Regions:
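Single conserved hydrophobic/aromatic residue that forms the stacking wall/gate
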Residues: 1-5, 9
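Hydrophobic alpha-helical bundle architecture
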Residues: 26-87, 99-103
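Extended hydrophobic packing segments that form well-structured cores
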Residues: 56-58, 63, 74, 97, ...
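A structural signal for small-residue-enriched, beta-sheet-centric alpha/beta enzyme cores
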Residues: 3, 90-96
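A charged nuclease-like catalytic/ligand-binding cleft shared by nucleic-acid processing domains
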Residues: 16-25, 135
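Generic recognition of cysteine residues
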Residues: 8-9, 40, 57, 86, ...
Length: 146
């Protein structure tokens, strides 16, 4: 029987597609190998994006099926996975991947659109969070806190 925690881990690994994992990095560790690197740390929104930024990410793609109105230290593109969420929280969204499920775009078309958005963001286009002035951090507290 699968636990909720193991389901979360499986979903995270599946986001890497068929690419082999080349390295597992410590929290905020810098990648030294080309390819899919996994970063140790919690998977919640603000802590994980803070860790990715500390690890050297310049642009973060954050997929969500619920939506969280936060902004990370690095430009963070919120990729929404369903149309319902986009309808209710459009000002939090950067990219609607739900168009694949609704048939409005093919997977290849949506992938091209997202790739173009990443290039635009890396070139200075503001994300939804940046336009709203959101730039939060959350440091992972591993161990005893006094």
């Amino acid at each position: 029987k699968s636990s909720a925690a193991s389901d979360v881990y499986k979903r995270q690994v599946q986001k890497g597609g068929s690419a082999p994992i080349v390295d597992v990095l410590p929290y905020a560790g810098r990648a030294t190998k080309h390819g899919l690197n996994m970063l140790c740390g919690p998977g919640n929104d603000m802590v994980s994006t803070t860790a990715l930024t500390a690890a050297g990410c310049h642009v973060i793609l954050f997929s969500t099926g619920r939506g969280t109105p936060f902004g990370a230290p690095a430009p963070t593109l919120k990729v929404f996975t369903n149309q319902r969420l986009c309808d209710h929280k459009a000002n939090w969204m950067d990219f609607n991947a739900g168009v694949i499920a609704t048939g409005e775009r093919t997977l290849d078309e949506a992938a091209h659109d997202l790739y173009q958005l990443v290039l635009e963001t890396a070139s200075g286009k503001l994300t939804s969070a940046e336009r709203r002035g959101c730039h939060e951090i959350s440091i992972w507290k591993d161990g005893v806190c006094l």
